[in-house]
Every structure is written in structure tokens, then in C-alpha cells.
């Protein structure tokens, strides 16, 4: 499976987020208290950008800024309505100090 570079780990401290694009898909990368997680940057309810939403680092959840749907960053599963479909997640690989994502 191909890997894409995101950034050095030192540039993504706890609570920070970053987006990268791969094949016209925006991917949100978040540092949840040292755990690096990646998911598609789109709410499954209406395609809103999740990167602009409120991040709960302790619970590893993000809230869509449009209608308040919350998503688990580990699984991509919606936790509250109006979203009911999960969003894609991506495996994260640490290569030295570089964060990389497995994409297909």
C-alpha cells in the first residue's frame, strides 16, 4: 500500500490538526494526546469540512461545525445525529519523525 508524507511529528503537537490531499480526497490528521489519527475530512451528513470543527482531544472526537454531528477519530463512526454513515479512516505510520498515511 502506498505511503504519503504528512509532516514531521514535531510539527503536530497534541491537539493540532492538519489536512493533506490525496487523489482529490482531503484527509484530516489529528494528534489526540500523542495518538496520530487520520480520517476523511468530510462529514457524511452533508460533506462539511470536519477540520474546522471542535476537537475533543481526551475523547478523540471531532464535531462537524455545520450541524453538530460528532465522529470518533479512531473509527470514523458517527456518534451523534444527523450523521449516521461512517467516514473513511487511514492507517498512520511513523517513519522516524515523519508522519505518513497508508492510502490506496
Each language-model region and where it sits:
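Short coil-to-beta-strand transition motifs
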Residues: 1-2, 87
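Short amphipathic
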Residues: 2-8
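Rieske [2Fe-2S] iron-sulfur-binding domain
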Residues: 17-104
Amino acid at each position: 500500500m502506498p505511503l504519503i508524507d504528512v509532516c514531521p511529528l514535531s510539527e503536530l503537537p497534541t491537539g493540532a490538526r492538519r489536512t493533506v490531499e490525496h487523489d482529490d480526497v482531503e484527509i484530516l490528521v489529528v494528534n489526540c494526546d500523542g495518538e496520530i489519527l487520520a480520517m476523511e475530512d468530510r462529514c457524511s451528513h452533508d460533506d462539511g469540512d470536519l477540520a474546522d470543527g471542535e476537537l475533543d482531544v481526551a475523547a478523540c472526537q471531532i464535531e462537524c461545525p455545520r450541524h453538530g454531528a460528532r465522529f470518533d477519530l479512531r473509527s470514523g463512526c458517527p456518534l451523534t445525529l444527523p450523521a449516521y454513515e461512517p467516514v473513511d479512516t487511514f492507517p498512520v505510520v511513523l517513519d522516524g519523525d515523519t508522519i505518513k498515511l497508508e492510502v490506496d
